[in-house]
């Protein structure tokens, strides 16, 4: 099953989730191997270029202005510092540099301040990605014109669970921005977070929403929630390791040609869990000790992991084999 489908039913997706674990991983790995080199992983790096004071009320987020998490508000980074961080990421093996700003929806003035950052990173020979919040169609076209490669806009969870995690926007708002980005021919990076109080049906529904987009996301980041003290979700029950690995596997089956990225939460994953995620179809990670406001394994730790697992870093453009 390597054909890209956009008509998955919820019943079909739930059936995948309930397969015996070994059967599910075998099916996912077989599809992964047909579309990618199973021993290659793409490396991205993520930088928070504007921290905190977000007006949204996402119950899990340290950057929301609604909660006292001890996070200090920081204004937009100067371009020289951004490019210095990008060069360091490139020297460490990253092929894509992602820049995130804690905005609900950026103003045109804010977009204009980010444009030189995008152009500077592109001039270094890296792929560019930004996550800036909800976009208008006009803003998406502007970002395309300046050469942006990827736009990240996660749907977070299922449509059914969405109002339980945020009230300042709705699920359709997320889809509208993804549509604007795809209309501008910018490649989409969109995934979700596990550990938001969702059940297996919610995970199935979330993946169904992603796979039934007009074009599958080029990248599907899947995050394991890192509970933040001071947020309403600071004591929420995390998913089990097998639940997370199952979600990776189902994502690979449903979106066979998308890059599936292990994102936040890897500090809680040992070698075995990460190895099973790679076997199930994950083929990208975020590199560097910080992901926005949460910790991430250091580069030496990841390099050691790659050596132990026999994994090679590859340029993003050379990752896909079919």
UniProtKB/Swiss-Prot annotation:
**Pathway the protein takes part in:** Cofactor biosynthesis; biotin biosynthesis; biotin from 7,8-diaminononanoate: step 2/2
Residues noted as binding [4Fe-4S] cluster in the record, renumbered to the chain: 54, 58, 61
| InterPro entries tied to this protein | Aldolase_TIM, BATS_dom, Biotin_synth/BioAB, Biotin_synthase, Elp3/MiaA/NifB-like_rSAM, rSAM
Question: Cofactor comment in the record?
Answer: Binds 1 [4Fe-4S] cluster. The cluster is coordinated with 3 cysteines and an exchangeable S-adenosyl-L-methionine. Binds 1 [2Fe-2S] cluster. The cluster is coordinated with 3 cysteines and 1 arginine.
Q: Which positions are annotated as binding [2Fe-2S] cluster?
A: 98, 129, 189, 261
Care to name a GO molecular-function term for this sequence? biotin synthase activity
Residue ranges constituting the Radical SAM core domain according to the UniProt record: 39-266
Q: What Enzyme Commission number(s) appear in the record? A: 2.8.1.6
Report the catalytic activity: (4R,5S)-dethiobiotin + (sulfur carrier)-SH + 2 reduced [2Fe-2S]-[ferredoxin] + 2 S-adenosyl-L-methionine = (sulfur carrier)-H + biotin + 2 5'-deoxyadenosine + 2 L-methionine + 2 oxidized [2Fe-2S]-[ferredoxin]
**Keyword Iron included in the entry's annotation:** yes
Q: Is Transmembrane helix a UniProt keyword of this protein?
A: no
Q: Which GO terms describe its biological process?
A: biotin biosynthetic process
Q: Which domain of life is it from?
A: Bacteria
**Keyword vocabulary terms for this entry:** 2Fe-2S, 4Fe-4S, Biotin biosynthesis, Iron, Iron-sulfur, Metal-binding, S-adenosyl-L-methionine, Transferase
**Cofactors (names):** [4Fe-4S] cluster; [2Fe-2S] cluster
- What is the annotated role of this protein in its UniProt record? Catalyzes the conversion of dethiobiotin (DTB) to biotin by the insertion of a sulfur atom into dethiobiotin via a radical-based mechanism.
PANTHER family recorded:
BIOTIN SYNTHASE (PTHR22976), BIOTIN SYNTHASE, MITOCHONDRIAL (PTHR22976:SF2)
Sequence similarity: Belongs to the radical SAM superfamily. Biotin synthase family.
Spell out the subunit comment.
Answer: Homodimer.
Name the chain's protein. Answer: Biotin synthase
Its taxonomic placement starts with: Bacteria, Pseudomonadati, Pseudomonadota, Gammaproteobacteria, Candidatus Pseudothioglobaceae
């Amino acid at each position: 099953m390597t054909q890209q489908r956009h008509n998955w039913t919820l019943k079909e997706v739930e059936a995948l989730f309930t397969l015996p674990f070994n059967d599910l991983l075998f099916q996912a790995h077989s599809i992964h191997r047909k579309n990618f080199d199973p021993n290659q992983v793409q490396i991205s790096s993520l930088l928070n270029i504007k921290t905190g004071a977000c007006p949204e009320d996402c119950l899990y987020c340290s950057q929301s202005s609604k909660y006292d998490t001890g996070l200090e508000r920081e204004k937009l980074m100067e371009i020289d510092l951004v490019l210095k961080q990008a060069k360091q990421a490139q020297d460490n093996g990253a092929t894509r540099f992602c820049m995130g700003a804690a905005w609900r929806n950026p103003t045109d003035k804010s977009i204009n301040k980010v444009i030189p950052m995008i152009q500077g990173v592109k001039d270094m020979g890296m792929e560019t990605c930004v996550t800036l919040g909800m976009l208008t169609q006009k803003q998406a076209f502007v970002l395309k014109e300046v050469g942006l490669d990827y736009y990240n806009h996660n749907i977070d969870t299922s449509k059914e669970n969405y109002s339980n995690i945020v009230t300042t926007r709705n699920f359709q708002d997320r889809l509208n921005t993804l549509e604007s980005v795809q209309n501008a021919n910018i490649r989409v990076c969109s995934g979700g977070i596990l550990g938001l109080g969702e059940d297996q049906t919610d995970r199935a529904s979330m993946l169904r929403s992603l796979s039934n987009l007009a074009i599958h996301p080029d990248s599907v980041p899947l995050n394991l929630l890192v509970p933040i003290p001071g947020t309403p979700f600071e004591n929420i029950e995390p998913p089990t390791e097998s639940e997370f690995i199952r979600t990776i596997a189902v994502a690979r089956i449903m979106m066979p040609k998308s890059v599936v990225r292990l994102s936040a939460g890897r500090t809680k994953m040992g070698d075995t869990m990460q190895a099973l995620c790679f076997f199930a179809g994950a083929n990208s990670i975020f590199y560097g000790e910080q992901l926005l406001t949460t910790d991430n394994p250091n580069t030496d730790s990841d390099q050691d992991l790659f050596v132990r697992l026999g994994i090679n870093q590859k340029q993003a453009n050379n990752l896909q084999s079919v």
